C-alpha cells in the first residue's frame, strides 16, 4: 500500500509537492484526470498513477482504498473538495488540501462530525493558500540574494469581509 495519493499531482503546486516527496524518500500514488500528463510524470519519477475524474465515485473510492491519506491539489477547490472529502469519509482516509478558499474551509468544518465518526481528519488549507506565500518568497529571494533559508510566520489580526 502506498502511504498517500496526490490528486492533481501534475499541476503547478502538485508537481512541486511530488518532487519534494521524492527527495524525502516518499513514493506517493499520483492521480488526476489527464492520463497523458500522469503517465509522463509517473515515468519521470518511477511512480504508479491512477487517472480518473473526481466525479467518478467508483474510481475515486477504488484509488483511495490503496492509500492511507489524500493530498488534494486539484482546484478550483470550490468545484472539487466535496467529492474528495466525501470519498475520504466513505473509505476512511485522511484528507489534506492546499486550498485557501473559505467556502471549502467552512464546508469541511460542517463535515467534522462525519469525519470523526469515520476516524479521519479533514484538513483544508494545508498549504495556507500557496500563491501568497510563493509571491512573498520570490520577493524576499530577490531582495536577499545571499540568503540560504527563509522562515515565514503568519499572524492573524482579526477577520471579516474585505471591501
What are these model-predicted stretches?
Residues 3, 27-29, 48, 149:
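Residues at the starts of beta-strands that form the adenosine-phosphate
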Residues 4-24:
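N-terminal Rossmann NAD(P)H-binding glycine-rich loop of SDR-like oxidoreductase domains
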Residues 24, 45, 90-91, 118, ...:
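Helix C-cap/helix->beta junction micro-motif
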Residues 26-37:
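Conserved glycine-rich Rossmann-like NAD(P)H-binding loop of the short-chain dehydrogenase/reductase
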Residues 30, 72, 96-97, 122-124:
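Hydrophobic residues in well-ordered beta-strands that form the structural core
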Residues 36-107:
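NAD(P)H-binding glycine-rich loop region in Rossmannoid oxidoreductase-like domains
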Residues 99-121:
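Rossmann-fold NAD(P)-binding glycine/threonine-rich loop
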Residues 127-129, 135-163:
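Conserved anion/nucleotide-ligand pocket segment
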Amino acid at each position: 500500500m502506498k502511504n498517500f495519493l496526490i490528486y492533481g499531482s501534475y499541476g503547478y503546486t502538485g508537481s512541486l509537492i511530488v518532487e519534494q516527496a521524492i527527495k524525502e524518500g516518499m513514493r506517493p500514488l499520483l492521480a488526476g484526470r489527464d492520463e497523458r500528463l500522469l503517465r509522463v510524470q509517473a515515468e519521470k519519477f518511477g511512480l504508479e498513477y491512477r487517472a480518473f475524474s473526481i466525479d467518478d465515485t467508483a474510481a475515486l473510492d477504488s484509488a483511495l482504498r490503496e492509500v492511507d491519506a489524500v493530498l488534494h491539489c486539484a482546484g478550483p477547490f470550490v468545484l472539487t473538495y466535496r467529492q474528495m472529502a466525501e470519498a475520504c469519509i466513505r473509505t476512511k482516509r485522511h484528507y489534506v488540501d492546499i486550498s485557501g478558499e473559505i467556502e471549502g474551509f467552512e464546508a469541511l468544518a460542517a463535515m467534522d462530525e462525519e469525519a470523526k465518526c469515520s476516524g479521519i481528519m479533514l484538513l483544508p488549507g494545508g498549504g495556507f493558500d500557496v500563491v501568497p506565500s510563493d509571491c512573498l518568497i520570490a520577493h524576499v529571494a530577490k531582495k536577499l540574494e545571499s540568503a540560504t533559508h527563509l522562515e515565514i510566520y503568519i499572524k492573524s489580526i482579526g477577520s471579516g469581509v474585505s471591501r
